[in-house]
Amino acid sequence: MSDACCGTTTSLESEQPRSPIDAEALPVVVIGAGPVGLAAAAHLAERGLDFLVLEAGEQAGASIAQWGHVRVFSPWKYDIDAAARRLLEAHGWTAPDPEWLPTGAEIVSHYLAPLAKALGPNVRFRSKVTAISRLGYDRVRTNGRDQAPFLIRLDDGEEIRARAVIDASGTWTTPNVLGASGLPARGEDEVEIEHALPDVLGADREAYQGKHTLVVGAGHSAATTLLALAQLGDTEVTWAIRAGDAARAYGGGGADALPARGALGARLHALVTSGRVRLLTGFFTHAVEKAGERVRVTSLDGRDISVDRIIGATGFRPDHSIASELRLDLDPILGSTRALAPLIDPNQHSCGTVPPHGADELAHPEPGYYAIGVKSYGRAPTFLLATGYEQARSVAAALAGDWEAARDVQLDLPETGVCSSNLAEAQEQRIGLATGISGGLLATPLPLATVSSGGSCCG
């Protein structure tokens, strides 16, 4: 009788394909044509590496275009990658005023669209990636795996082979749920919830005019939306947060290092104080259910509120399902790499102390696969655009075999990145503030001193 029933390791490995394909001759595939994905492409181009950018949307910065009406807090001088700038200037591009605060639409039209054009036909739109694997290998098979090219499948069935994959697809399409337990609130899937930044004073005005809208969340996206809603006449606005007070959301007013951000918090505070915006603190959403033509939202403590519309500004989470056949080493809490998690975990330290990091911290057991940008941070709300740019530079250097450069990570963010907006607290601890949309899109370098590792800003 045979002593094996299910195949042995030897027989399993003997089935591996012997492909004549030279993976090193294939391009590096970059998933996503947002700021970090295009920055990665610019660094790859600068190093003479073949690349192909696959963007699911119709244009560069497709996610940013969805909040094109929003003006950001950090000026142009913090929002442009160095390699991207060099490439653009070589094509005759004139940089915007470095002190100007751009809108999302301006970031796309003045920076990302010209950058995609400069990168040429190597940037493809309407190319949604649905799966990544190794050619001829599922996740279990090992022998010869590292020499096999990556296989990228698109939603139309097309398959592309690559020597490496840089996943900069972001998290915009996977927002966090309203439910306080990490699961959708009871009934949440049956009601309409807006998770983007609606243009309530423009294209979406009719949907909110004269209605009662509930905004859930305590970040800058929530604040921006609340201020816009408050400008609509005959409109009732309610704001629900989990915290016991809104101090973090208000910020430091006129003392803020970024005046536009400070003004945002001060205006929101005034609206709450005046009663124009009703604030519900300690509100942990448990149930969402239709109540006639309205929606009833119930907190864990039994409080409820009936509204016409809900805007969930609760942040985003990564979706790693497209890489389910790759060997990933994900932190069980954050969903970042296990090596990166201790550096960014908001439960452990102030996000202002996140150290520079690059290819080594972003690496998985699957050689040649890197997730960069906001997706690399998992659920940590501490990502900054400048961090993503340095990730792109480091990973491109690693793929070029220049490990000295890859490991010489020099992030120009001295003690920056507190993910709350409580400037008074930040100043007391001598740390800077991070701000932005969709996981800290924007960079805000501030010259500040060191904070102890025991501090916490983002819990």
Please name every model-derived segment.
Residues 2-11, 15, 317, 323, ...:
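C-terminal, flexible cofactor-proximal segment of oxidoreductases
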Residues 6-21, 104, 169-232, 237, ...:
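Glycine-rich dinucleotide-binding loop and its adjacent helix/turn
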Residues 26-53, 222-232:
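N-terminal Rossmann-like FAD-binding beta1-loop-alpha1 element of flavoenzymes
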Residues 31, 54, 159-173, 216, ...:
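Short hydrophobic core segments
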Residues 59-110, 196, 200-202, 239-258, ...:
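Glycine-rich active-site loop/strand segments that organize a redox cofactor
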Residues 94-164, 169-174, 279, 286-297, ...:
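Feature captures the FAD/FMN-dependent oxidoreductase FAD-binding
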Residues 127, 131, 230-332, 397, ...:
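A Rossmann-like FAD-binding core segment of flavoenzymes
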Residues 212-249, 261, 356-380, 386-398:
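Active-site substrate-recognition segment that forms the wall
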